[in-house]
From Swiss-Prot:
Keywords: Ribonucleoprotein, Ribosomal protein. One of its GO terms (biological process) is translation. It comes from the Bacteria. Belongs to the bacterial ribosomal protein bL35 family. It holds the Pfam family Ribosomal_L35p. It comes from Borreliella afzelii (strain PKo). GO terms for molecular function: structural constituent of ribosome. GO terms for cellular component: cytosolic large ribosomal subunit. This is Large ribosomal subunit protein bL35.
Amino acid sequence: MANKMKTRKSAKKRYSFTVNGKVKYKKQNLRHILTKKSSKRKRNLRKSGNLSCFEVKRIKTLLPYD
């Protein structure tokens, strides 16, 4: 009997899949030390990011059952 692949929990916390199969993630640098960052920069950091098609393949190997 073959072993099941394990899900990488660190990747599961950081990435999620959209309905179309794209990978979504939350941008960094919005936790603390926000006073020196401009409002425009903070507003852009609130948007979710999308990975390129090359990185999607790597993330799908880390998250086999999602």
